[in-house]
Amino acid sequence: MAERERALTPPYGGVFVPRARVMDPDDVRRATWRMAHEILERNHGTDGLVLIGLQTGGVPITGRLAEAIDSVSGVMVPTGTLDVAFYRDDIGLRPVLPEAATQIPVDLTAKTVVLIDDVLFTGRTVRAALNALSDFGRARAIQLAVMIDRGHRELPIRPDYVGKNLPTRREEMVDVGEEGVWIGTLEDK
């Protein structure tokens, strides 16, 4: 495999082959800080704020956003992780994956939840997350933050906070990692 190529887990399978880097690590850092400021401004601080990262891509972004919010506000907001595999509407069409840990440290009742993912594509993962969150209390508000919004929505879902809008073709893939954001294709193993 080339330096950036990596094997992908189901449902995609195959190998991600990068075509171009669209955000370097500094771009991702700046986007994270901007989103942190936007979250604080929109919510008038950190009171009642909870950050929930979607397994697996949203989890590292959640940690970085929490650190940025702490640096700006001096408050470390509660964070958690959410696995939506069994809430998806396409569960029968995809291979069943091992369940990733859902860890939500607080009752979400009357809280403002910022749901965080790496890439927003069709909106189906977010729809599943909204269903899953209801098991943890009735949030006052749920907001959505994504590092990349690539369009191609199949459901009426729109993010509140976006690191970068990145128009893509449907067959392209986007990979968000520590080295930045890459656009590429999926090839058989």
Please report, for each region that a protein language model flagged, where it lies by residue.
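PRPP-associated nucleotide enzymes
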Residues: 1-189
